[in-house]
């Protein structure tokens, strides 16, 4: 997938990228299938397995914090003391940044709202109320895909690209990485919604 993406960036076609995406999707589907079989139908997820999954999630979150720490470091390193190569000013000359009070502010509100709705879904599940959980999870997924759509529109309307100085690089890498997380999160939440609808719950 990484090699295919790099090849596509350098105009070598997207066949390898599509094959990588197909392989990743197949892996995700079969992994979800195995998790459902082992936990819901076979009862193989013991307390030790649950603890391992919790630790895995915590370590994953720590690794993501490190990722975004690096992105913010790059941004502040470049913006607080601009190099003479970019005119010693921030943003660089001929770079017209997006208005933070338009789509970025709306996307922030959407993400905060999705946090509220997914918390609603969690508390509904803990209270054994399936219908409110289904409704709130559907709202969360819809907000996630709406965020992705607005992010795409923001990229289309931007007057700069990823190759336009350090500003374009840090902007598109940081926001693109974040947008990728939203897409992956929305996909996983969609799988959770399917499991809620199919009543894949244990007695505990």
From Swiss-Prot:
A single MF term (Gene Ontology): cytochrome-c oxidase activity
EC identifiers of the protein: 7.1.1.9
Entry keyword set: Membrane, Mitochondrion, Mitochondrion inner membrane, Translocase, Transmembrane, Transmembrane helix
Cited PROSITE patterns: COX3
GO biological-process terms attached to the record: mitochondrial electron transport, cytochrome c to oxygen
Primary role: Component of the cytochrome c oxidase, the last enzyme in the mitochondrial electron transport chain which drives oxidative phosphorylation. The respiratory chain contains 3 multisubunit complexes succinate dehydrogenase (complex II, CII), ubiquinol-cytochrome c oxidoreductase (cytochrome b-c1 complex, complex III, CIII) and cytochrome c oxidase (complex IV, CIV), that cooperate to transfer electrons derived from NADH and succinate to molecular oxygen, creating an electrochemical gradient over the inner membrane that drives transmembrane transport and the ATP synthase.
Subunit structure: Component of the cytochrome c oxidase (complex IV, CIV), a multisubunit enzyme composed of a catalytic core of 3 subunits and several supernumerary subunits. The complex exists as a monomer or a dimer and forms supercomplexes (SCs) in the inner mitochondrial membrane with ubiquinol-cytochrome c oxidoreductase (cytochrome b-c1 complex, complex III, CIII).
Protein known as: Cytochrome c oxidase subunit 3
Organism: Enteroctopus dofleini (North Pacific giant octopus)
Gene field: COIII
């Amino acid at each position: 997938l990484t090699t295919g993406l790099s090849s596509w960036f350098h105009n070598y076609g997207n066949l390898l990228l599509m094959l990588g995406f197909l392989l990743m999707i197949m892996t995700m589907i079969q992994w979800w299938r195995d998790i459902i079989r082992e936990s819901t139908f076979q009862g193989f997820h013991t307390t030790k397995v649950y603890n391992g999954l919790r630790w895995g999630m915590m370590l994953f979150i720590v690794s993501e914090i490190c990722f975004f720490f690096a992105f913010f470091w790059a941004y502040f390193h470049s913006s607080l003391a601009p190099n003479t190569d970019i005119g010693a000013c921030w943003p660089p000359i001929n770079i017209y940044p997006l208005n933070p009070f338009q789509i970025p502010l709306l996307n922030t509100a959407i993400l905060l709202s999705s946090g509220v709705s997914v918390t609603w879904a969690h508390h509904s599940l803990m209270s054994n109320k399936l219908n409110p959980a289904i409704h709130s999870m559907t709202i969360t997924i819809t907000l996630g895909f709406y965020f992705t759509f607005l992010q795409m529109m923001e990229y289309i309307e931007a007057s700069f690209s990823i190759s336009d100085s350090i500003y374009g690089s840090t902007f598109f890498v940081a926001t693109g990485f974040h947008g990728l997380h939203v897409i992956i999160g929305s996909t996983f939440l969609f799988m959770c919604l399917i499991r809620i609808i199919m009543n894949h719950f244990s007695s505990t």
